[in-house]
């Protein structure tokens, strides 16, 4: 899906009920991988610092990843009941995460047959690279991508968290239609 279509999609998704629809919305808001969202635990969320800390063992790069949480993401979490350890636990199998096909099923029910959950990460990447002034390394860090250049990676010890927060606020503003925060779009 092209990034320009994501705001309309998110408005339609907001009308959908169910844990899988909420998980999909959270995944799009955070540009996370679907497995990271499906396995998300309440204990990983630091509400005071407004961040989600994904443990290394659940990350593709095997390195802990801190995800800045926007108002939209926090509001979505506030709507969830924390009756189990998992944020997006299965309604069918209590105590288990939603299935790996559950978010894809939401897309199919919305007649978005050519769209994949992972494609929203591509939409985020395209939007950030084409329409904002955020540096490439901030965008790649938001996607939890490893630096390909080993020499560059050896010196990159920080995670650019504050800059990534600005990026995620701008993304949330775009896809939720929150014009109050669009001032961050080009302030990298």
Language-model-detected regions and their locations in the chain:
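Active-site/catalytic core of tyrosine-dependent DNA strand-transfer enzymes
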Residues: 1-8, 49, 58, 68-119, ...
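Basic, Lys/Arg- and aromatic-enriched nucleic-acid-binding interface segment
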Residues: 1-40, 48, 59-63, 94, ...
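C-terminal secondary-structure termini that scaffold catalytic or DNA-interacting sites
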Residues: 3, 59-60, 71-73, 79-84, ...
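Short coil/turn helix-boundary motifs
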Residues: 13-17, 30, 80, 132, ...
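DNA-binding alpha-helical recognition surfaces that contact promoter or target DNA
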Residues: 39, 127, 141
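Short, polar N-cap/turn motifs at the start of nucleic acid-interacting alpha helices
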Residues: 44-51, 114, 133-156, 177-183
């Amino acid at each position: 899906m092209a990034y320009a279509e994501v705001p309309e999609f998110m408005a339609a998704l907001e009308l959908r009920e169910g844990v899988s629809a909420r998980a999909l919305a959270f995944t799009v808001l955070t540009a996370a991988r679907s497995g990271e969202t499906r396995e998300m635990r309440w204990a990983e969320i630091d509400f005071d610092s407004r961040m989600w800390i994904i443990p290394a063992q659940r990350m593709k790069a095997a390195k802990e990843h801190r995800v800045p949480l926007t108002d939209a993401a926090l509001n979505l979490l506030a709507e969830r009941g924390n009756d189990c350890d998992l944020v997006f636990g299965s309604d069918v199998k209590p105590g288990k995460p939603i299935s790996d096909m559950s978010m894809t099923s939401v897309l199919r029910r919305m007649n978005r047959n050519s769209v994949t959950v992972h494609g929203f990460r591509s939409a985020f990447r395209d939007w950030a690279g084409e329409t904002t002034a955020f540096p490439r390394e901030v965008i790649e860090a938001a996607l939890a991508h490893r630096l390909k250049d080993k020499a560059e990676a050896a010196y990159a010890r920080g995670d650019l968290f504050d800059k990534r927060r600005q990026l995620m606020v701008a993304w949330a503003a775009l896809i939720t239609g929150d014009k109050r925060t669009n001032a961050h779009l080009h302030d990298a």
